[in-house]
Amino acid sequence: MAQQTRGPQVTGGEPVVVTSPWRSLVLSYGAEGEAPESDSSKALERDRAFAHHMRRMFQRPTLDVDIVNHCNLNCACCCHYSPIADPGFLAPEDLEQDLALLAQIEGVEEFFDAICLMGGEPLLHPQLPEIAWLVRRYLPSAIIRLVTNGILLGDASAELWEALHEVGAQILITPYPTGIDYVGLVELATSHGIDAVLGGGLAVSDEGEAFFLKNPLDERGEQDPAESFIACPLAGSTMQLLDHRIYPCNGGALLGRLNERFGTAFRHEPDDYLELASIRNADEIETFRRTKKPMCRYCAHGLVERIAWGPSSRSASEWLVGCS
């Protein structure tokens, strides 16, 4: 699923140019250098990026868990790379291992705004009720949030509705332009005693056009990590639980999907993630999310552009710099 953009403002279809952040003000975030000019459009974009970055750091992050690799939509430029991911489901026993480690971290339940069950499309998972109960068993006071496109919600089983109600889950429904009665889905969830809202993965222009941001990746890793980190609308705010690790963002955590599909050579360095078994308390996660990561060098935020929502062609050009 693609994340809703809350970053630097985008106008028209032109690429956003996000240059050096306020380097003199963000030394604690790993940037270095001199303060920028103050009388240019680039400086304005820079200021916006920095302001958004600071707002993000004062908000509690979510911890996202992809319980399904694939999706029943096929969105171009999906930041979870679902259109090109091999179909697959997170096994409850694998999730339980991670939850057991997560539960041992002091203050972790209060630290995250919510544990988000997503994908891909989480409603495709045949063991979703069991997964919801696992999260509640290990994290009794955490907010559980199901993030879905809603297509399958009208056909949800009584078992699933009961589980979501009993664990106190929320439902975040992303309203894609598919002709579905999304207001009706919210009312359906409410009738089962479940809080549901519309929001999340799709942005809408002033003209009413649904769009994503295309966030191209530079396989060569020649981008400035500090600038990418400051400009990123996701880093440190939508953290990812994957294979016994916590990553600062979804796209960075799931780079292996690009390698598998396109033969790219993206790689993770030890500083790109936290091993669950090594985390003592939530303060360590907070420190981790506030700093640039080696993999930030892959994000070409200076080439971000707005694209109308539509189907993926599954071509490399949707995710990689320099591909046609």
Predicted regions and their residues:
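Boundary detector for helix-to-coil junctions that initiate low-complexity/charged tails
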Residues: 1-17, 21
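A broadly conserved sequence feature marking short terminus-proximal activation segments
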Residues: 16-47, 200, 245-271
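Conserved alpha-helical substructure of the radical SAM core
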Residues: 18-146, 153-156, 318-324
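A structural signal for well-ordered alpha-helical scaffolds and beta->alpha junctions
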Residues: 60, 92-95, 128, 178-182, ...
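Flexible, charged surface loops at secondary-structure boundaries
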Residues: 107-110, 164-166, 290
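Conserved AdoMet/S-adenosylmethionine-binding subsite of the radical SAM
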Residues: 125-243, 247-252, 257
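Accessory C-terminal segments flanking Radical SAM cores
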Residues: 216-324
